[in-house]
Amino acid sequence: LIRLKAGQTHLLDDIDHLKNRRVRLSGELIQTQFRIGVNRLERVVKTRLNDPTVAASFFPDPTEQALLARQAKKRRAMKQTKTGSQLTRKLHATGRTGHSKEKLRQKSNDIAVNSRHARWTSFVRTSVISSTMREFFGSSQLSQFMDQTNPLAEVTHKRRLSSLGPGGLHRDRAGLIVRGIHPSYYGRVCPIETPEGKNAGLVGSLASFAQINADGFVMAPYYKMQKEQIRPNTQGFFLLTACYEDQAVLASGDVNLAKPRVSTRLRRAFTEHAPKKIDYLGLCPIQFMSIATALIPFLEHDDANRALMGSNMQRQAVSLLRSERAFVGTGLEGRITRDSGSLLVAKQTGYVTYADAQRIEYVTPKDDPTGTQFKLIAHSVELESYHRSNQDSCLHHRPLVEANTWVQKGDCLADNTATFGGELALGRNIFVGYMPWEGYNFEDAVLVSERLVFDDLFTSIHIERYDVETARLQDGQEYFT
């Protein structure tokens, strides 16, 4: 309280600070839902146990149970005496008395176990847990179909952060403060990429190098600075949480350390310090933005609103019939396609033995510690051929390797519909003229060449599924015409 009286307001708790927020991953959400299902099952079991008719079948009266046991024992003894003599004569004739007795005893034990299992399965209904999990995956606000429009949309959807859902905020009651950009977002949450409309500021995306620790806090990587020199560790960098950042002086990865004073951040404030006062240095300039925003060339010259629109519109680009690599890129096109999982790469260096539109086969040498044997391991990679995605677009692989050729570890084996040579290819490179043309492009109108249509430059394939039902009527079976 004395420090607050002195004006040290940085000691106040900030609800929007990332040190006071944690990320609940999908595994934790599923675990919580499974716990709800187990609790429901417990209540169902307790309810059925309280039912006298149900409980009597599992916990009968001891006196009655003893009487029933004696009667059952007498019946078994009489039955064994009656059938034992006949069975013994047959077994002695064949010479397999001991083996058949053991088999008969095992069969009776199995029948007893199955009867007890049948009683408990009719008593404990696992459908309660199944319906709870189905409810989460089918109707939860945080359960969505993966966006498969292009590889960038897949990666962005997997790295999305949402403040909505159970235990979160409501879009109609969230104000401007909670939607705003907090200084602790630097290097953790992208300040640019967010939806337009009611979800603005409530749904975001992880920064390019951000990671989430076991406690659910978002961490950002930094280089440790000591005497104006980078002090590496085993990883080469340090991962800092937002709570630890408040105690250090941080600088961006593109500052000029030769200047007497550089721009820094300290306790959520942007200030200036001498280079020797810097505690941590950022990795690179794109550290604070998401991967979709990092794909925009010359982002520093863009307006903030246009950068936001460009980040969202890239995810809406439909895969074309003929893809083409962009002339101007940022260097992340190849890494995004590999991280999305839609690109097929060689796991080891090997020799391609067979390649067609359906599969690619290659062999790799097996490591032998003794060095006396040479063995080959065969690998087969299945290719997708005109599969329908969640957005009714086309998922197709084109092989890039031929038979009787060598491939290195990490080489691209096949392209998909949104890649070219292993790099992301969203759209085509076209020549654009910014000029009037006899009034045809008045205001926001666009005049295009007929080559865009006849040469299929922007032609895409869509696969849709339609279900038609037939019924069996009194007059006969319906059929398609």
Residues covered by each model-derived region:
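Long, charge-dense accessory insertions within large macromolecular proteins
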Residues: K19-R76, T81-G84, K90-G95, S100-E193, ...
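Short, charged/polar, low-complexity loop and linker segments
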Residues: H10-L12
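Short active-site loop/helix that positions an aromatic residue
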Residues: A210-A214
